[in-house]
Regions:
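Membrane-interface loop-to-helix entry segments
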Residues: 9-15, 107-115, 176-180
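Hydrophobic alpha-helical transmembrane segments
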Residues: 14-15, 40-45, 69, 84-88, ...
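Alpha-helix C-terminal capping segments
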Residues: 73-82
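Short helix-perturbing small/polar motifs within transmembrane alpha-helices
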Residues: 111-152
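Interfacial aromatic-anchored transmembrane helix boundaries in multi-pass membrane proteins
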Residues: 55-63, 89-120
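C-terminal transmembrane helix-loop-helix hairpin of multi-pass membrane proteins
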Residues: 135-145, 163-202
Length: 202
């Protein structure tokens, strides 16, 4: 899902960067009111786990890749704003040090994985979590990956409207990957709720 440099149009680059700056401002304003050593430790742990998982990539047609995201898990464990921050840190490190995702595409990558994946997973889990941890965790993980992948496809299509292939490919592949991520998210949340339920922010 990491979009490299040279793929997006200038309009998509600018619009996603503007959106990212707005979300980042709100996130830092919210986090400054609740930040603690406990939250810092959890954020660092989730960021490290997500970083490791995202480094396993499979290339797909259309100029991008397929990989685990971890957005739903980040949002559920940390809350949406700290979850966003953890994902943004991961994406910055990947782009600046490992060149995984381009700097010009950082806005788009962050909107997809740090905003859409985190917030959609968090909201859906909050709606379903009281009924079944497994159902809520699975559907949150699946939806977060599918929406992030589909939006990535939209950004690629807007940058090259001649071909709809990237949109279709990204949506279909991430619908499939979402099944695996949903299972991992559900398993992780079930384990955490059993061993240390107090650390979950939902």
């Amino acid at each position: 899902m990491h979009i490299p440099d040279g793929v997006l149009s200038i309009n998509v680059i600018l619009s996603t960067y503007v959106a990212l700056m707005g979300v980042t401002y709100v996130a830092f304003s919210r986090i400054s009111k609740i930040w603690s050593s406990s939250l810092a430790g959890k954020t660092s742990s989730i960021a490290a786990l997500t970083f490791a998982a995202q480094m396993i990539n499979w290339p797909v047609p259309g100029g991008t890749s397929l990989h685990f995201v971890g957005g739903a898990l980040s949002g559920i464990v940390l809350g949406p704003w700290a979850g966003f921050t953890a994902m943004l840190i991961v994406l910055l490190v990947q782009a600046l040090i490992f060149h995984d995702g381009g700097l010009t595409a950082l806005g788009a990558n962050a909107i997809n994985m740090a905003v859409v994946a985190v917030f959609s997973g968090y909201v859906l889990y909050k709606l379903l979590g009281r009924r079944s941890t497994w159902i809520a965790g699975f559907t949150s993980g699946w939806l977060s990956v599918f929406l992030a992948g589909a939006l990535c496809g939209v950004e690629l299509w807007l940058s090259n409207p001649i071909s709809i292939t990237p949109l279709v490919v990204m949506a279909l592949w991430h619908a499939a990957l979402g099944v695996i991520e949903g299972a991992i998210t559900a398993s992780a949340i079930a384990y955490v709720k059993k061993k240390a339920p107090q650390i979950i922010e939902v």
